[in-house]
């Protein structure tokens, strides 16, 4: 009996944090997710059969006709449930639980020569479910609709067979990760920016704001910049299309040998777009910088000199593209992100999938709208606990600029920003919060058990996971 109790305590819950760009999964109580995979998946046809590829394998080989898809919508709500389920399942079976054994009648213990089952095994399921031993905590955005929440608990209980389940809001978990029960959480992800007021561990729904100006929007601004770049427009050639290259001086045309694929062997255009996105991510990490303030980039600084002049005089940053073309980027590296704070600064691009941003979609305005949606008495407390999270918030200078904007808008109350200096914690804020929450002894009473789910149906998630 004692052994059974010890073993039971060893079972760790799994925390699953699905995003638009990546899906994070790991064991509760650990400080980073063991599994971080792209939420994108690949589809191609081989010998007249449709094949699917998940995880980092989508980057490896440009297979003929390989097309890239994403089951999530840009608003953070699932659009394709069948594929979302497969991607999520891959995230934990590939690194955490391992695929479960198939048919229990052919596992060496219960082999039946003629396929006849012993009568006492008639009702046994033919396949063990992937989460039969692990409770599951999943995250969701603050505006996830009821239908989507119910579908999530349904998949976890019925398809994966989890014994206990909980669905937690991203904003609340990011606040917990920063050690706060009340906070104003600014989450800058790949597909959107959200501002979530959290009070005593609950989100204040009327104050939740979000806009589509996330990391992918910044990538689209980079594409617009490269089209109008001088001395020459820049074409991004992904690594898989470069056979060899020769070093060239900055600003000189690339000297590279390119790979070509015959039409029947070439991957779909969506594969190239995904690979270009990897170069753009590298560019954002190495070059792009947020104008630190005070005031907008287009305004005049406190000393009477225009901010653009100051930006031009600061040293540039070099970057080399996969085909060997390289250039030093000056003021342009500030311009591509300025529209997160000033919509008028957006670089126009008629071909972009993103419409021109409005001022209401910028970070300072989202924060203003979020604070206006909550009780006046709570506002100073939220401003003293601003938590910044999300991978795109790692842009150089982002928190400095946010601090300047908030001090200008709210000179009275004390403004304090908490942004983890640890890259992993900032990228995986809501996962870390989920890991902390699911490993607390007092959290046991919060789980929705399989028994409760069977009694009340998927609607229980609305009552229990507020």
Swiss-Prot record:
GO terms for biological process: chromatin remodeling; DNA repair; regulation of transcription by RNA polymerase II. Keywords: Activator, Chromatin regulator, DNA damage, DNA repair, Nucleus, Transcription, Transcription regulation. Its main location: nucleus. InterPro entries: Actin, Actin_CS, ATPase_NBD. Pfam families: Actin (PF00022). It is found in: Nucleus. GO terms for molecular function: chromatin binding. GO terms for cellular component: NuA4 histone acetyltransferase complex; SWI/SNF complex. Chromatin interaction component of the NuA4 histone acetyltransferase complex which is involved in transcriptional activation of selected genes principally by acetylation of nucleosomal histone H4 and H2A. The NuA4 complex is also involved in DNA repair. Is required for NuA4 complex integrity. Component of the SWR1 complex which mediates the ATP-dependent exchange of histone H2A for the H2A variant HZT1 leading to transcriptional regulation of selected genes by chromatin remodeling. Component of the INO80 complex which remodels chromatin by shifting nucleosomes and is involved in DNA repair. This is Actin-related protein 4. It comes from Aspergillus fumigatus (strain ATCC MYA-4609 / CBS 101355 / FGSC A1100 / Af293). The lineage of its organism: Eukaryota, Fungi, Dikarya, Ascomycota, Pezizomycotina. The gene is arp4.
């Amino acid at each position: 009996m004692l052994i059974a109790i010890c073993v039971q305590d060893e079972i760790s819950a799994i925390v699953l944090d699905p995003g638009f760009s990546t899906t994070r999964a790991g064991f509760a109580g650990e400080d980073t997710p063991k599994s971080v995979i792209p939420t994108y998946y690949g589809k191609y046809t081989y010998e007249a059969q449709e094949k699917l590829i998940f995880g980092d394998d989508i980057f490896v080989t440009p297979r003929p006709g390989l097309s890239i898809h994403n089951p999530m919508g840009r608003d953070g709500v699932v659009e394709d449930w069948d594929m979302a389920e497969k991607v999520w399942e891959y995230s934990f079976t590939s690194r955490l639980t391992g695929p479960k054994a198939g048919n229990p009648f052919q596992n060496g213990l219960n082999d039946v020569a003629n396929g006849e089952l012993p009568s006492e095994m008639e009702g046994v399921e033919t396949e063990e479910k992937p989460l039969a031993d692990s409770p599951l905590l999943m995250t969701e955005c603050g505006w996830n609709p009821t239908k989507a929440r119910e579908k999530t608990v349904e998949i976890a209980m019925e398809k994966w067979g989890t014994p206990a389940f909980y669905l937690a809001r991203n904003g609340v978990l990011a606040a917990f990760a920063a050690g706060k029960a009340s906070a104003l959480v600014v989450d800058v992800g790949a597909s959107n920016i959200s501002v979530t007021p959290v009070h005593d561990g609950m989100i204040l729904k009327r104050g939740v704001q979000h806009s589509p100006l996330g990391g992918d929007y910044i990538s689209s601004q980079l594409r617009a910049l490269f089209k109008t770049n001088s001395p020459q427009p820049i074409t991004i050639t992904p690594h898989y299309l470069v056979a060899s290259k020769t070093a060239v001086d900055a600003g000189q045309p690339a000297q590279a040998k390119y790979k070509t694929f015959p039409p029947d062997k070439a991957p779909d255009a969506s594969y190239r777009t995904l690979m270009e996105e990897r170069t753009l991510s590298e560019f954002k990490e190495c070059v792009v910088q947020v104008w630190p303030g005070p005031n907008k980039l287009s305004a005049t600084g406190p000393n009477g000199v225009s901010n653009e002049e100051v930006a031009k005089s600061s040293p540039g940053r070099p970057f080399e593209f996969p085909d060997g073309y390289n250039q030093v980027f000056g003021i342009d590296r500030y311009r591509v992100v300025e529209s997160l704070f000033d919509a008028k600064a957006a670089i126009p691009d008629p071909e972009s999938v993103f419409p021109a941003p409005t001022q209401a979609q910028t970070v300072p305005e989202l924060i203003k709208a979020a604070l206006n949606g909550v009780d006046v008495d709570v506002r100073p407390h939220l401003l003293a606990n601003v938590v910044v999270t999300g991978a795109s918030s790692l842009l150089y200078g982002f928190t400095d600029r946010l601090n300047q904007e908030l001090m200008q808008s709210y000179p009275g109350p004390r403004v304090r920003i908490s942004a983890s200096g640890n890259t992993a914690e900032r990228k995986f804020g809501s996962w870390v919060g989920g890991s902390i929450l699911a490993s607390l002894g007092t959290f046991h009473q919060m789980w929705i058990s399989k028994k409760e789910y069977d009694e009340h149906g998927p609607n229980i998630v609305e009552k229990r996971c507020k």
